Amino acid sequence: MARLPFDNDIKTLRFLAGEMTQGDLGDRVGVTRQTIAAIEQGKYSPSLEVAFRIARVFGKPLEEVFRWAED
Protein backbone atom coordinates (compact mmCIF):
# COMPACT_ATOMS: atom_id res chain seq x y z
CA MET A 1 0.00 0.00 0.00
CA ALA A 2 1.40 3.40 -0.99
CA ARG A 3 1.77 6.18 1.54
CA LEU A 4 -0.68 9.03 1.42
CA PRO A 5 0.40 12.32 -0.20
CA PHE A 6 0.60 14.12 3.15
CA ASP A 7 2.62 13.89 6.35
CA ASN A 8 1.65 14.63 9.92
CA ASP A 9 3.28 15.54 13.22
CA ILE A 10 0.87 13.65 15.47
CA LYS A 11 3.54 11.48 17.09
CA THR A 12 5.69 14.53 17.94
CA LEU A 13 2.67 16.44 19.23
CA ARG A 14 1.66 13.49 21.42
CA PHE A 15 5.17 13.41 22.92
CA LEU A 16 5.12 17.15 23.57
CA ALA A 17 1.71 16.77 25.23
CA GLY A 18 3.17 14.76 28.10
CA GLU A 19 3.75 11.58 26.11
CA MET A 20 0.04 11.14 25.36
CA THR A 21 -0.67 7.61 24.14
CA GLN A 22 -2.36 6.76 20.87
CA GLY A 23 -5.23 5.38 22.94
CA ASP A 24 -5.59 8.61 24.92
CA LEU A 25 -5.68 10.65 21.71
CA GLY A 26 -8.15 8.24 20.15
CA ASP A 27 -10.44 8.56 23.18
CA ARG A 28 -10.34 12.35 22.99
CA VAL A 29 -11.00 12.36 19.24
CA GLY A 30 -13.57 9.54 19.19
CA VAL A 31 -11.63 6.93 17.21
CA THR A 32 -9.68 3.80 18.10
CA ARG A 33 -6.01 3.56 18.97
CA GLN A 34 -5.55 1.56 15.77
CA THR A 35 -6.98 4.43 13.72
CA ILE A 36 -4.56 6.91 15.31
CA ALA A 37 -1.66 4.52 14.62
CA ALA A 38 -2.70 4.16 10.96
CA ILE A 39 -3.03 7.94 10.55
CA GLU A 40 0.40 8.51 12.13
CA GLN A 41 1.98 5.95 9.80
CA GLY A 42 0.37 7.46 6.70
CA LYS A 43 -1.68 4.34 6.03
CA TYR A 44 -5.08 5.95 6.58
CA SER A 45 -6.49 9.31 5.59
CA PRO A 46 -8.65 10.79 8.36
CA SER A 47 -11.94 12.46 7.58
CA LEU A 48 -11.85 16.23 7.69
CA GLU A 49 -13.81 16.11 10.94
CA VAL A 50 -11.29 13.77 12.60
CA ALA A 51 -8.37 15.84 11.31
CA PHE A 52 -9.87 18.99 12.86
CA ARG A 53 -10.56 17.14 16.12
CA ILE A 54 -6.94 15.99 16.29
CA ALA A 55 -5.70 19.52 15.68
CA ARG A 56 -8.06 20.88 18.34
CA VAL A 57 -6.73 18.44 20.97
CA PHE A 58 -3.27 19.94 20.50
CA GLY A 59 -4.50 23.53 20.16
CA LYS A 60 -2.94 23.78 16.70
CA PRO A 61 -4.30 24.87 13.32
CA LEU A 62 -4.85 22.00 10.91
CA GLU A 63 -1.87 22.98 8.74
CA GLU A 64 0.50 22.59 11.71
CA VAL A 65 -0.62 18.98 12.19
CA PHE A 66 -1.05 17.83 8.56
CA ARG A 67 0.82 18.97 5.45
CA TRP A 68 1.39 17.81 1.88
CA ALA A 69 4.44 15.58 1.56
CA GLU A 70 7.29 16.94 -0.50
CA ASP A 71 8.32 14.86 -3.52
How should these model regions be labeled?
Residues G23, Q34, E63:
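Residues within helix-turn-helix
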Residues E64-D71:
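Short amphipathic recognition helices of helix-turn-helix/homeodomain-type DNA-binding modules
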Residues G30-S45:
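Recognition helix of helix-turn-helix/homeodomain-like DNA-binding domains
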Residues D9-R28:
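Short basic helix-loop element that most often maps to the first helix and adjoining turn
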Residues M1-P5:
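A detector for short, charged/polar N-terminal pre-domain segments
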Residues R14, E40, A69:
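DNA major-groove recognition helix of helix-turn-helix
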Residues E49-E64:
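DNA major-groove recognition helix of helix-turn-helix/homeodomain DNA-binding modules
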